[in-house]
Amino acid sequence: MEGEEESEQRKNLPKDDGTLALGIDFGSCRISSAVWNKNKKGTQLVKDQNKNDIYFDAFLSFEKEIDYGMNRLNDGVDISSKYIDDEKKEEEKNEKEKKEEDYGIDRLNEGVEVSNKQKDEGKKEEVYDDKPHIIKELKEFPSNPENVVYNIKQILGQKYNSDYLKKIKQNLIFKIEEEKKEDEKSENKKNTNRPVFKLKNKTIPFEKLASYLFKKCIDDAEKNLKNKVGNVVVSIPHSFNKIQRQAIKDAVRIAGIENVHIINDTTAALIYYAFKYHIHKTEYFLICDMGQNKLDCAVVRINKQNCIKVLSSGGDNRFGGEKFNQPLIKLLYENFINDGGNDFLKKNPKETFKFLTSVEMAKRNLTFMKETEINLQKIDGENDIIHSLTREDFDKLNEKNYAYVLECIDQVIKESKIDRSQLNNVILLGESLRIPKLVELIGEKFEDCNFITELYNIISQGAAIYAAHWGNKLNSDKFKNFKVYDITQLSLGIRTEGDLISTILPRGSRIPIKVTKSFLTTQDHQKKVKFEVYQGERKFSKDNDLLCRIILKGITENSRGTVELDVTFEVNEDNILTVKANEKNKNEEVQISAFANGNMDEEEVKKLIEIAERARKEDEEKEERVKASLRLYELILKFTTMFGENEELWSIIEEYRNWLMHAGIVPKQEYEKKRIELMRKMPRDEEFYEEEKKEEEKKVVEAVA
């Protein structure tokens, strides 16, 4: 995907030599970014808009935040409407340029304001500019909150008809529609199942909105360091699916950078920690990062050579700080309606905005205060919401949410297969993991661990270090032997005969990784083979998630079971799965790429794992039955080829073929019994039995459906 036309600022910078490596923490609540400059071996000096030096080793972190009175919106984008006549166009343009010049590298949230213009005031026709600008600050609540776009990260890459998007749309003030594209086969437009932001008479894809945010990070870095960004690493939750990851990479490309890499949030944080604090021995870390809409947990091992290995990862891509607001929102609103208040939610966007952000602010206040007050005058035009809230009240409302966080932590430790006593450090990131009661509960579980909670913006800084390492620009002795090993979230395999899954990469496999496995054809004179790639923990394809299909054509036509095919699974650092298939000893191959995390969110992943655990015994029994029936079927086919011309033997073979066709579900032992019976009724052929023995020994070769 091509990026936007290069800005004048970039054209005037020195030719890109990969000097600047940019790390971006694409959070739900804000975007923060950090830079590594290879020309500065140590402290990097950068001036902010107040002419103050920022010191932080060899990289800088400048965050983006917006203060909406009492709130910092999630990735807020303000699409404001202005009527402009022909006589005022030049004046408006100059004013806009002046405002943009003043933005500097303030601590801004991901807010973007898109201005609309009117060519003819008499017609009152709104025409919206495609190029938004970042809002610096709003002193009061916005006058048009329905044009403030937030939660871009959560919507990016979602399907329009997904249950998740349907659910979150209920709490959004701005409008989302399904994208429609021209259909070449008809005059009508066809639905794409892709959500877009609705702005009056036009729509804007969320990839485009996200690109404005990434472009601001890139422009700020280049403006202040007077050089071009070479590599960009964006950190995201580990559970982001293939569509979300690709959408983020596309957004960065739209912003003008082609060299983009993806890394998990928790991994990025540990990279920074390993760089900042010298580790003298192997240590185990539990790291938890809770944003506005996600919870990431991981158990990681770091040795003294700065080799970072993720042992397990988990959490919930739909659980975050907003969940702690919901019980309070429900309590306040129900009390307000019961006391005679008017229903204002969704009916009055501005007052709804005030109400929701006041609840968010109250939650934050209770982090450092024991009591706070929500005071909203005439919220419905007539009645007030005035409510005093203590920490104890808030904790009681969120007991179930606290328990759920602890469950996620317990699960990720269990999957790491280490003893809890081996943990040395616990790192808590994100504002929601500063809630006093939640910190207390986690502390009680890990009393002997070193707690680290005051590390701000370390995810973006870790991403910047990784960007430098990725571009071979990390001129640091500390990270001379630096390596990162992440893991696959679910098992990956292909469907084989009998609907069985042949696992090629088990869940928790270290990435990057490349594995090849051999298979055989299942039909005589087969011309092509279809491979179906699945992820999941169940034994049968119908119980797992289909990732992709590839077809290998032009294979050698021969008897079934004689043509050997190689299937290769390769997962890179971005969790991108590439599948290749070729006939053994032939150069021709086919391949396809898919993200190893597929289309599932963390909740679906956890559900699949739980189902797989409960069904494991049943699946294993069914698998054994299917394999036994296939062995009998193979024997019938071989005897048909060997003795098909002998009428007496043919009738015996046909008898067992009919039994197999009508047997239904029988125990594995019954298939084995029939197989032995059939072998005893056939003439003994030494060559055949020698071949059977070799087949038993060659267990690595399986049949492809």
What are the language-model segments listed below?
Residues 1-170, 175-193, 198-212, 219-705:
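Oxyanion-binding/catalytic loops of NTP- or PPi-dependent enzymes
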